[in-house]
């Protein structure tokens, strides 16, 4: 009887060990396969624009730049886009950003909203700070003003006054510089941001049209259909609007 009991215990222990090993292998296999396959690729869905209808009166197309300053200070209806920081965007844009950030998180990308709507005082302070940095480097007043505007437009020309502009970085790259375009977060945004209504506001090699240097962190809400059409065109917001209004 004792021998039979010992065998029963032995068989039970073996069964437990096998079960645990099987569970461990099943847990580990997907992770090993993912490692062998490499990082997940982010690929934008195709869009032919067949059903796109341009509406020149769409408020989300509000355009501001050094050649087209605000005629009057905007007053967008705001909502919290990020509750932790309290950063706000225009209400529709805020809801879209939250959906986008949640979708990115599901793909292992942690987006960080670092700036949204800014009032005139905040925009003016940002411009003056940038300008002062150039003055301290020995630039003249005129040179400093021009160089600052390429990066941080004056208050009346700053996209952040619309409520639709969002500076987006990631937890692993929290610095606003062009190096952000090497990150997985930028890759994700390039592929999927348009599906949530956001476009890259200042694309590379488009400074002649936008008046601002390449800013991979600066995204602009224009609505899903508009964003998909703009992304498909490969144009900046300025170029897209000019083309649509001319046709």
Model-derived features: where do they sit?
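Extracytoplasmic cell-surface/polysaccharide-interacting catalytic and binding patches
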Residues: 2-247
